[in-house]
Design a protein with these regions (language model features):
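Divalent metal-binding pocket/active-site signature
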Residues: 6-102, 122-123, 127, 145-154, ...
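Short secondary-structure capping/turn micro-motifs that flank functional sites
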Residues: 70-71, 115-116, 180
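Short Asp/Glu-rich motifs
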Residues: 73-75, 118, 183
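Glycine-rich, positively charged active-site loop/lid region within alpha/beta enzyme cores that binds
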Residues: 102-169
């Protein structure tokens, strides 16, 4: 397991830069307009700076986006940095398609098991094999049948089994596939960063 580095909500990137050789990605970064939409401009500016940092460090990003689909795509397009994961994906298939077209991987959490999450199931079925990941998003969003508990990594098999049924494959095959995808993206490569 290798850590990712994030900075929230400030521009102090020194801890990330100082630890870059230990990191597998920059994040969780991104936009969340759910609770404070009035901070949208500041969030977009910080997100753009974080994407530039990831570019300089030659690291993928782990992106959080909530109630900010258009703004997320806008910042990504302005930065022209399309290398990483959209974590805990809960968007629509059209939004997913735009992210996939830009080169991102889609990570599915325990939300896929929730009764009201048909849009997440549709997105999970749509994602190509080589662009799919699974995650816990611990300590939140425990999958059914553990919903209501604090989430933990040991619950990931519930998500994998459910997702495998949705994709008409076996849990074992899906686990191997998503593990390989994560390793391919997050295994540190020889440094060629500018910092």
């Amino acid at each position: 397991m290798t850590p990712t580095g994030g900075s929230c909500p400030r521009y102090d990137f020194a801890p990330i830069i100082d630890n870059r050789k230990k990191l597998s990605a920059v994040g969780e970064i991104g936009l969340d307009f759910h609770y404070a939409p009035e901070t949208a401009k500041a969030q977009c500016d910080l997100f753009a700076a974080q994407l530039e940092l990831a570019r300089e460090l030659n690291l993928p990003v782990v992106i959080h986006t909530r109630d900010a689909d258009d703004a997320t795509l806008g910042v990504l397009d302005e930065s022209d940095f399309h290398y990483g994961i959209i974590h805990c994906f809960t968007g629509s298939v059209p939004f997913e398609r735009q992210l996939l077209d830009r080169g991102f991987m889609i990570s599915i959490s325990g939300i896929v098991t929730f009764r009201a999450a048909e849009n997440v199931r549709e997105a999970a079925r749509y994602a190509p094999d080589d662009r799919l990941l699974v995650e816990t998003d611990s300590p939140f969003l425990a999958p059914v049948p553990m919903r209501g508990n604090e989430n933990e990594p040991s619950f990931l098999p519930y998500t994998v089994h459910f997702l495998a049924e949705q994709r008409k494959t076996t849990a074992e095959s899906l686990a191997l596939l998503t593990t390989a995808n994560a390793e391919n993206l997050l295994t540190p490569s020889p440094p060629n960063s500018q910092l």
